[in-house]
Swiss-Prot record:
Sections of the chain in a coiled coil: none
Main location as per UniProt: cytoplasm
Record's protein name: Ribosomal RNA small subunit methyltransferase A
Residues where S-adenosyl-L-methionine binds: H13, L15, G40, E61, D85, N103
Entry-linked NCBIfam families: ksgA
Record's subcellular location: Cytoplasm
Reactions that this protein is recorded to catalyse: adenosine(1518)/adenosine(1519) in 16S rRNA + 4 S-adenosyl-L-methionine = N(6)-dimethyladenosine(1518)/N(6)-dimethyladenosine(1519) in 16S rRNA + 4 S-adenosyl-L-homocysteine + 4 H(+)
Pfam families (UniProt xref): RrnaAD (PF00398)
Biological role: Specifically dimethylates two adjacent adenosines (A1518 and A1519) in the loop of a conserved hairpin near the 3'-end of 16S rRNA in the 30S particle. May play a critical role in biogenesis of 30S subunits.
Primary gene name: rsmA
UniProt organism field: Bordetella avium (strain 197N)
Amino acid sequence: MSQHQARKRFGQHFLTDESVIDAIVRAIAPARDDAIVEIGPGLSALTAPLIARLNRLSVVEIDRDLAARLRKKYPPEQLSVVEADALTVDFRQFGAGMRVVGNLPYNISSPLLFHLMGAADLVRDQHFMLQREVIDRMVAEPRSADYGRLSVMLQSRYRMEKLFDVPPEAFDPPPRVVSAVVRMVPLGPDRPQPASEAAFEAVVARAFSQRRKMLRRGLGDWAAHVPWDDIGVPPTARAEEVGVAQFIRLTDALLAAGVIKA
């Protein structure tokens, strides 16, 4: 097959370092009967070792040339290829117990992480390579510089662990940033949950739109309806100081007051 040229519009950086590939596969620890979905298989760096360990693998690939290569390289009983933009794919189609993996395109990483939350109740775990700075934001704690909307939203749904860094030279072409690998395990149904996920997202987004301001100012006219003492949040707190459980209580208080709708 002819050499594939990486396409900027798809954010393509192909993983080539065998030691990194091996470390990722060991972190995933696939079992023969696992239902694994790989996003962005590219030139099969992860696909090949995964297929060697699985009965069957599903992949989502936006690049039609790469999708055609995959179909030519692997028989359909080994590999199912969904040729589509991952942001448009309904991941619920893959069923309960799925494990999602991939070297995610850095230009759509945050929207894709939010998109995948819609199938989190069916997911066993997720292993992704992303920009290190994105993973640092994902796992950040309150009162840290990296803590923000992404931290709160993902931590409300997953237990996350940064596994290891990956240098630019592990890719072709090399990205301009250091990458890292993260493990995401969905929290169970007994996790703290807001009365409305949509309202929770709206409150968190509004709070972090002015992260340096005191929360009562950042929330605008909503602030007057918040029982600050009851929810355990000082009215002088900034969004970057408020934990996930506190944001959930804040959301439920605003819903109860009729300030926002479910």
